[in-house]
Amino acid sequence: MDTILVFSLMIASYDSNKNDLRKSSCQVEQWPSFFSEDVRSNKDLVVRVPLEIHTDTKGTPFIQNQPIATLRCLGSGRRVTVHLVYSERRPKVKYIMKNLPVITDLPRNSTASPRCHLRATSQFQNGSLLTAFLPGISQCTVYSAKDRSASSEMVPITTSSTTPRSKGDEATSTGAFPNPLTQGIDMSLKRRQKWSLVVKALIAVTLLLGGAAIIVFVIFEVPCPSQCLRVRQLCQCQWLWRRKRKEEDQKPGTTESQLDSQPEKVKHNVPNSSDSKKTTDIAIIYQTYF
C-alpha cells in the first residue's frame, strides 16, 4: 500500500509540475530607464507570433531562430523576468512555450530606452498568441519584429496596452488583435495546481501516519495503548461467547446418544455377570463334594 501511495505522489507531482510557470522563465538584464523603482508593477503582455514556417531540403518544417517581437521596456533598472504562460491559437487549445530567450539591445542614442527582443526556439503556428508575465516592468510597447527601423520604433505597428495585475483583475486588453481567453485558462491552471497540492498533502499525511504506525508497533514492538487492549479484550470475549454457544448447541445431541447407548451396554453386561456368578457357584459346590 505504501508503494502505491509513493507512486501516486510521484505521478501527482509530475502532473502538477508539467504546467509549472517556473519551468518556462527567462531573464534579461535591464538597463537604467526613466522610471523610478516606486512605479514598478506586474504586467500582462500579449503578443502575436508572426513567424513563418520554413522547410529544409528534406521537406521537414522548421522555424528559424529569429525575433518574433520587439519590446520597448521602461522598467525599474533591475533584472526583468519574463514568465511564459501559454500560446493560444484557438479557443480551448493552448500551446506551452518553454524556450523564449530575451535579448537586450543597447540603443545607439543614450537617451533612448533599451529594447528587449523575444526569440522563439520552438515550432509554433502562424497567428498564435503569446501571453507572458513581465514583473518589474512599468510600461511596455510591442513592435513588429520585421520592421526595426527608426520610423517603426517611433510609431508602433502592433501595440499592447497592459494593466497592473491584481487579485481581482487578471484580464489583458490588447489594441491590435483579439483578446484570448486568458482569464479562464489562468483560473483552470490555478485550480489544477491547488487540487494537486491538496492531493499531495493527503498522500503525504497518509504515508507519514502509516509509516509511523508500522515503525512503532511492528518494528519496535511497542505495546498497544489501553484503549487498544480494551477493544481487543472485547473482541476476544465476543469470540469466546460465540464459541461456547456453538458448543452448547452441539452438546444435547451427543448426550442423548450417549444415554441411549449406555442402557444397551448395561443390558448386555448384566447376563454376563450372572453367568459368571453361576459358574463360580458350581465350581465351589463341585469342590466341596469331592
Curated annotation (Swiss-Prot):
Question: Where does this protein reside within or beyond the cell?
Answer: Membrane
Regions crossing the membrane: 202-222
> Which keywords fit this entry according to its UniProt record?
Membrane, Transmembrane, Transmembrane helix
Task: Return the annotated region ranges for Disordered.
Answer: 153-178, 246-276
Xref: Pfam families: DUF4711 (PF15829)
Q: Which GO terms describe its cellular component?
A: membrane
Q: InterPro entries this protein is in?
A: DUF4711
Membrane topology per record: Single-pass membrane protein
Keyword Cell cycle in annotation: no
Locations of Polar residues compositional bias?
157-178, 252-261
Q: What is this protein called?
A: Uncharacterized protein C17orf78 homolog
Q: Which organism is it from?
A: Mus musculus (Mouse)
